[in-house]
Amino acid sequence: MTEELLKAESCFVLRAEDRADMFAQVYKKLLEQRLVAAGFLDQVVDREEDFPTGLASCNLAPGLPNLAFPHTEGCFVKQQRVVPIKLLAPVSFKSMVDPSRELPVGFCFMLLDQKADGQAELLARTMTFLSQAEPAALSRIFAQTDPAGLYSALREEGF
């Protein structure tokens, strides 16, 4: 990833009651950083309900947390960014493969892009990183418990 897509101030470690609470906490921080527009929260919640982004991590390596890649329409985004979110306790996301299945997700990569097809590009780049990283490196990244450590671990692995 390029330096512009990953910023220390946009790496979060948080505890959320549920998916809606996680979205609300992250939205507040992104709004303060002027990365998203008003309306982003409702849109990301609605889009996640209609087009789930949860993904079981079993194909990457055993023992890794399930992942999610929430995003929304570009008109609600002010600046391109990949926002890593470590969840201290898993929250439930619907599976993108089987939306009838709920997954306990422990880590999210929120994708912010103003372009209509930008999220697909960011998703592809993020998935390439995840599929090429060593399982031990991913374990180290996903084990971080503070934002600075999360940012450092991602940068050290070339994200």
PLM region spans:
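Cytosolic covalent-transfer regions centered on His/Cys nucleophiles
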Residues: 1-159
